[in-house]
Amino acid sequence: MKVILRKDVKNLGMVGDIVEVKPGYGRNYLIPQGLAEVATEGAVKNWQLGAERRAKKIEAELKAAQAAASKLKDIVLTFTKSVNTEGVVFGSVNKADIYKALKELGHEIEKENIELNMPVKKLGETDVNIYFKPTVSAVIKVKIEPVVVEAK
């Protein structure tokens, strides 16, 4: 099944791309979510008519994404967590924690753009990817430090 992508879809393509997908993926996910439409002759012609306008919009979005990515490139988010005597962290740092910390610093991102397969559960620094567009991403560092408890 051929579809025209209305929005960027990770691992599939960018806005305006005509891609071949399995029929179930197209009918059950891409089209209902508004991410794509069936690539009929009429739809392709309509899409091509608005291509110049969309190209300018895409270029502006790409520049904004690159600017946002450049602002994030040197960021280190530091979290303090309790640890036991062996240095094992109680709890973890997940997408929601990273999202909240970036929001507090004034960065506008979507939680879905944070690529974190598993919560961070170890002391030290971990690299986390933030994707703005399929071709634009930034790497931030997430650092977990132990809570300092003063002896009595």
UniProtKB/Swiss-Prot annotation:
GO terms for biological process: translation. Transmembrane segments: none annotated. One of its GO terms (molecular function) is rRNA binding. One of its GO terms (cellular component) is ribosome. InterPro entries: Ribosomal_bL9 (IPR000244), Ribosomal_bL9/RNase_H1_N (IPR009027), Ribosomal_bL9_bac/chp (IPR020594), Ribosomal_bL9_C (IPR020069), Ribosomal_bL9_C_sf (IPR036791), Ribosomal_bL9_N (IPR020070), Ribosomal_bL9_N_sf (IPR036935). It comes from the Bacteria. Binds to the 23S rRNA. Belongs to the bacterial ribosomal protein bL9 family. This is Large ribosomal subunit protein bL9. It comes from Elusimicrobium minutum (strain Pei191).
